[in-house]
């Protein structure tokens, strides 16, 4: 069943003054991407060690990939080889690394979300999140799909994780996190399951999902923030994360329907960043 369309204000963005657009753009950059990034109340614990132990992460392949990107930092190596009791911080320097460690977690962790997913079946390896995961011992990431009990959830925690997964989307497609057919979906699922296992509420998980998606799809969320401010009159800190992460704004089709046509009216006043997002390692 398609979601209800959003109620849009009658504001015509083509009438907004260029100086206001520029000022709101700069403000949105600061609000979405603080200098130190976002630190969230989720810890990796021993989840990555378990992924290495079962072969879902091949440490040598992982190191080799990052050699061409300047190498892994001491801290990054540490969280791949030791339990981590530190809260996760996401920023532009580590957003790709976090994507690549959370991806196999969401892919390999045994959970009803994956059990009930359209991915579950003989063709599981045909999806970008499974077949595209080549940093395990086996080059076919599909062999790790829904296989290991890495994060255990109580029935209450499962209900929370399931609800958030079913109601969060990503701009590269029209599927919810509960259908994690690409790396961003699998990574967000892993993060949501971790957070739920550590006692976070639905509200916290929607907020954290929005923060991570913003760093993974920066241009898209800058435009969503501008849409909220210039079209709807809502400052980014006051935006409802559950609404912003929903189909109407965070899915590819929703964004194309509601956000892009409005932003296209002012696009010539916006900086052209050209920061594309890929669904591979």
Describe the predicted segments one by one.
Residues 170-171, 180, 186-189, 193-281:
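A cross-kingdom marker for long, charged
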Residues 21-186, 201-203:
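Acidic/His-rich structured neighborhood in mature extracellular/periplasmic domains
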Residues 1-23:
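N-terminal, intrinsically disordered, polar/charged segments of Gram-positive cell-envelope systems
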